[in-house]
Structures are given as structure tokens and as C-alpha cells.
């Protein structure tokens, strides 16, 4: 009888534990706020009769209410996340958030959406994505999509492929993926990325430069059809390139690609990208290659890194620098490696 009662009690506990209303998430507050909250908790848990014991719980309020600083109107913040051999870039404006690509899936289990992107969204206090851009359907760019959709609602998506069809197919092929959208979560609106499509958010302009409307996939090459997005704020600009190659770069340059402060090096800095035309047209101050440590492709190619450096750009690479962050402000453009600015003991030295 006791075992039966225990089993029933555990059923109720498991049900409560899985309910959405049973827990909530808060943004990652600075350590002094956490220390203050822990001190208040220790005070509140003292024995009855301890002076002002219950007031200790009030010390937790700053931790629960803290929100990270957001950019001012016309400014933006970028996080080129460290997802290994793949791509995931978070762009924040004053009130909105955009994710460009969702990182790779790990065949040993898990994906970048679950392991990297969702925790970053939580740490930044982001409970909703206004825009999700999936540049193309390669798994190193879309492998974490279903985990992202399970973590936060997405108002609309842009992609160079049919996102709804891809999600259905992926659910059939990977039914056991954690957070895999068993409830069928999809973006509220799913659109194609097409050259000339543009919108504004908080004084920041987002414009697709590639592919052209109705353009067929070149030779069946998904890379060539990648969405290319330019982010233009009041002070600085950012170019997100997917996996386009030299041919598409030449097309962008011929169409009058404006100078750009930060460029995500196309195709992880492969030897078949970051051609002279793109490098010369962009005139970037910073180039970022998202690639995995000791990846089998040899990304980024040494010649590509030299090309950007010779053009005067600082060259960042996630296999060496980890996540690369940037903040565009009226006072200037601040770009840094998270690993260097906020070093942890588990980082190699």
C-alpha cells in the first residue's frame, strides 16, 4: 500500500514538474546580484525568531527582475555564437531579436539550438524571436531549428527553402530529437528570402541582398541560394552571408554592395569564398569565420584569412576566439571575443 501511495505521489510530482506554469526563467544577472540574492535566501532560511527573517526574501527581487541592457534605437548588438562547425548569429535591437541560422545538429545527440542558442536567449532575457532566418537547408545551419522553435515562439521566418516541408521531413527522420516540436511548433509566418525585401525595427534596417526573386538554385547547389542579409543601423552595418560562393559574391559586388563594418565570412571562410571582389567591395573592419576546432574541412582557409587581413580587417574565428560579440553605438563599434573578455577556468590558456 505504501508503494502504491508513493507511486501516485510521484505521478503528481512529475506532472507538476512538467507543467509550464511550474517554473519560469530569468535572465543571467551579474554576480553581485546573485550574491545578494543568495545572502537574502540564507537570511530567510534561519530558524524562527531570527530578526526580520522573512525580509530576506526581498533580496531576491532584484535578481528576478533584472533585465540585460538593450541597444538604443538605431543601434544593434550581435552575437556570433560558438556552435562549432556551423552558423548561428543573434542580432538584437532596442525591442526585437533576430536569429540568423540555428547551428548544427550533433549526431551523437543534441544540437546547437538546445545546447547553445536556447541558453543564450534565456541569458539575454529573450522570450520570443521576432525573426528567424534560415539561410539554406544544410544541417550545420538548420540542425538546431526544432529546438529553437520548442524553446521560444517565432513571429516569422525567412528561408531559401520551404521551412514547413523541411520541419515535417526532419520530424519523420529524427522523431526522438529533444525539444523536437512534437507539438508541431512552427513560425507564425513563413516567407522566402528575396533580394530587395526589407523591414525596419527600432531604427535598424534589415535588407535581403540574395537570392533574386524566383531565382533557381544554381546547379542544385543549396549554398549558392543562401539568404544574404544586411543589417544597417544608424552608425554601423553588418553582413550575414550564409554559404554563398565566389560567383554569388561577384554578383553582390556588381550590384553595388555598400561598405560594411562587419562581415560574416561566407561558407565559414572556405577557399571557395571571400573572393577579392567581395573583400574589396565590403571594405570591412572585421570579418568573422564561424568554424569548429580542428574541423575536417580546414576552415578557415589560410588564403582567405590572409586576404581579409591584407584588406585591413580584423579576422575573428570561432575555433580560436569562441563567440564573437559586437555592439554598435554612437560612441563607436565595439567588437570582442567573449572568451577573452569573460575568461573562465575551463577555457584553455
Where are these regions (language model features)?
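Non-globular, low-confidence helical/coil segments that flank catalytic cores
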Residues: 1-349
Amino acid at each position: 500500500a505504501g508503494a502504491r501511495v508513493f507511486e501516485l505521489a510521484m505521478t503528481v510530482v512529475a506532472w507538476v514538474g512538467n507543467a509550464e506554469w511550474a517554473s519560469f526563467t530569468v535572465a543571467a544577472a551579474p554576480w553581485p546580484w546573485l550574491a545578494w540574492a543568495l545572502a537574502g535566501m540564507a537570511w530567510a532560511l534561519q530558524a524562527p525568531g531570527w530578526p526580520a527573517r522573512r525580509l530576506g526574501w526581498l533580496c531576491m527581487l532584484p535578481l528576478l527582475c533584472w533585465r540585460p541592457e538593450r541597444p538604443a534605437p538605431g543601434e544593434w548588438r550581435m552575437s556570433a555564437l560558438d556552435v562549432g562547425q556551423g552558423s548561428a548569429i543573434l542580432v538584437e535591437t532596442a525591442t526585437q531579436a533576430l536569429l540568423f541560422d540555428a547551428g548544427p545538429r550533433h549526431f551523437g545527440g543534441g544540437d546547437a539550438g538546445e545546447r547553445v542558442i536556447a541558453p543564450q536567449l534565456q541569458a539575454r532575457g529573450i522570450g520570443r524571436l521576432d525573426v528567424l532566418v534560415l539561410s539554406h537547408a544544410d544541417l550545420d545551419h538548420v540542425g538546431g531549428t526544432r529546438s529553437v522553435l520548442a524553446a521560444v515562439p517565432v513571429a516569422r521566418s525567412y528561408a531559401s527553402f520551404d521551412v514547413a516541408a523541411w520541419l515535417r521531413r526532419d520530424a519523420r527522420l529524427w522523431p526522438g530529437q529533444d525539444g523536437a516540436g512534437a507539438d508541431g511548433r512552427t513560425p507564425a509566418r513563413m516567407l522566402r528570402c528575396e533580394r530587395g525585401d526589407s523591414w525596419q525595427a527600432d531604427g535598424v534596417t534589415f535588407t535581403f541582398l540574395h537570392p533574386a526573386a524566383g531565382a533557381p538554385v544554381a546547379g542544385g547547389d543549396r549554398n549558392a541560394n543562401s539568404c544574404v542579409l544586411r543589417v544597417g543601423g544608424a552608425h554601423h552595418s553588418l553582413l550575414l552571408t550564409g554559404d554563398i560562393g565566389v560567383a554569388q559574391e561577384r554578383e553582390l559586388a556588381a550590384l553595388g554592395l555598400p561598405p560594411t563594418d562587419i562581415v560574416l565570412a561566407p561558407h565559414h571562410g572556405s577557399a571557395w569564398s571571400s573572393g577579392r571582389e567581395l573583400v574589396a567591395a565590403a571594405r570591412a573592419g572585421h570579418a568573422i569565420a564561424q568554424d569548429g576546432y580542428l574541423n575536417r574541412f580546414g576552415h578557415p582557409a589560410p588564403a582567405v584569412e590572409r586576404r581579409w587581413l591584407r584588406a585591413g580587417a580584423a579576422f575573428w574565428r570561432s575555433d580560436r576566439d569562441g563567440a564573437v560579440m559586437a555592439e554598435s553605438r554612437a560612441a563607436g563599434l565595439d567588437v570582442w571575443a567573449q572568451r577573452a573578455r569573460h575568461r573562465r577556468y575551463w577555457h584553455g590558456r
